[in-house]
A protein has these predicted regions:
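Short hydrophobic beta-strand element within catalytic cores of glycosyltransferases
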Residues: 262, 278-289
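C-terminal alpha-helical cap of glycosyltransferases
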Residues: 343-360
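Donor-nucleotide binding loops and adjacent catalytic segments primarily
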Residues: 41, 46, 50, 173-178, ...
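Active-site-proximal region of nucleotide-activated glycan assembly enzymes
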Residues: 53, 112-174
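A short, well-ordered alpha-helix in the C-terminal region of glycosyltransferases
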Residues: 330-344
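Conserved nucleotide-sugar phosphate-binding/catalytic loop shared by glycosyltransferases and other
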Residues: 3-10, 30-79, 227, 309-311
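Glycosyltransferases and closely related glycan-assembly transferases
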Residues: 85-96, 104-119, 132-137
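Acidic donor-binding loop of glycosyltransferase active sites
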Residues: 93-95, 247, 255-270, 277-278
Length: 360
């Protein structure tokens, strides 16, 4: 069996793609799996780290304003589709999976034009433009939220949930506290700005460090690369405040946390559901169709999360966080409700659908 998985750009696309590949390889150890990403993006290093080969396309997204790069966009797309077509003809995959990100569209266009079975994995509650355009061409669309028939043909939809790393919910709290050097007698707040960081969360957290100390709250703070030097300097001045550029052991970070502050990317939301963590979501305003707000509202509408807008975060985020940290009953209520939304078998179900296409 040969499989191409295309897409990337952020952890929210890369980690589900790797989870799908791992499940395919678990069932079919002989499978040949090739990733296709965008040159210069995160997947070009993260995918090889996970043990898979990746090939890069020279493709970027459209800018929101008129730029010279936008004028070249059609040329780049044409070249990327042509290169993707050559890759497909050389590799001869039995199926192609698109997980979103710049490289996903050229590969799916090339695959569907050659009648190769194709599957889209849409992570968000609001479908992106590219996936909506590709929907008529692909064979199957795996989604994470109810109501997606307003974007896609209903006969192609399968409600699966999002693939999440299987170990993410297996962290042991005692081991986690020891790993991060945290005090078991104190509450722990985890702040995660996504794999690329988040300026609003970082600035609000930096401004609240004294308040957290005074309240006896411990902090695990994933800053992203750009803010890390400043955050480390600030956090090093106080006990119990830990700034990290990137948290490799998210299973232990979730296990240690009593409350989580996070962006509302699809992967983050799925992980919070699976780990059952009381959470405050601050959707990024810098995403297509404001899809993070829609992801967050899917939880908030069921009483499973708190939402603070990016605009209001500087003034309100840590007032709300400290209230929640001081209210164990509310933490437990949010935890129970968010866990009800988890789909722990998402990866298995997606690979089931993929293998059905291969066997046809």
């Amino acid at each position: 069996m040969k499989l191409i998985i295309s897409g990337g750009g952020t952890g929210g696309h890369i980690f589900p793609a790797v989870a799908i590949a791992n499940e395919v390889r678990r069932r079919h150890p002989e499978a040949e799996i090739l990733f296709v990403g965008a040159n210069g993006r995160m997947e070009m290093t993260r995918v090889p780290d996970a043990g898979y080969k990746i090939v890069g396309l020279d493709i970027t997204g459209l800018q929101r304003r008129l730029t010279p790069q936008n004028l070249m966009f059609p040329v780049r797309v044409f070249r990327a589709v042509r290169k993707a077509g050559k890759l497909i003809e050389e590799f001869r995959p039995d199926a192609v999976v698109g997980v979103g990100g710049y490289a996903s569209a050229p590969v799916l266009l090339a695959a569907t034009s050659r009648a190769i079975p194709s599957l889209i994995q849409e992570q968000n509650s609001y479908a992106g433009l590219v996936n909506k355009l590709l929907a008529k061409r692909v064979n199957r669309i795996c989604v994470a939220y109810d109501g997606m028939e307003k974007f896609f043909p209903a006969d192609k939809l399968v409600l699966t949930g999002n693939p999440v790393r299987s170990e993410i919910s297996l962290g042991d709290r005692s081991a986690a506290l020891h790993f991060f050097g945290l005090d078991p007698s104190k509450q722990t707040l985890l702040v995660v700005g996504g794999s690329l960081g988040a300026r609003t969360l970082n600035q609000a957290t930096a401004a609240a460090l004294t308040r957290l100390q005074e309240a006896g709250i411990q902090l695990l703070w994933q800053t992203g690369k750009l803010y890390f030097p400043e955050a480390r300097q600030q956090a090093d001045q106080a006990a119990g405040l830990h700034a990290l550029e990137f948290i490799q052991r998210m299973d232990l970070a979730y296990a240690a946390a009593d409350v989580v502050i996070s962006r509302a990317g699809a992967l983050s939301v799925s992980e919070l559901c699976l780990t059952g963590k009381a959470c405050i979501l601050v959707p990024s305003p810098n995403v297509a169709e404001d899809h993070q707000t829609k992801n967050a509202l899917a939880l908030v509408s069921k009483g499973a999360a708190v939402l603070i807008t990016d605009e209001h975060a500087p003034a309100r985020l840590y007032d709300e966080a400290l209230r929640l940290l001081s209210d164990p009953e509310r933490q437990q209520q949010l935890s129970l409700r968010v866990r009800e939304l988890a789909r722990p078998d998402a990866t298995v179900t997606i690979v089931d659908e993929l293998l059905k296409l291969v066997r046809k």
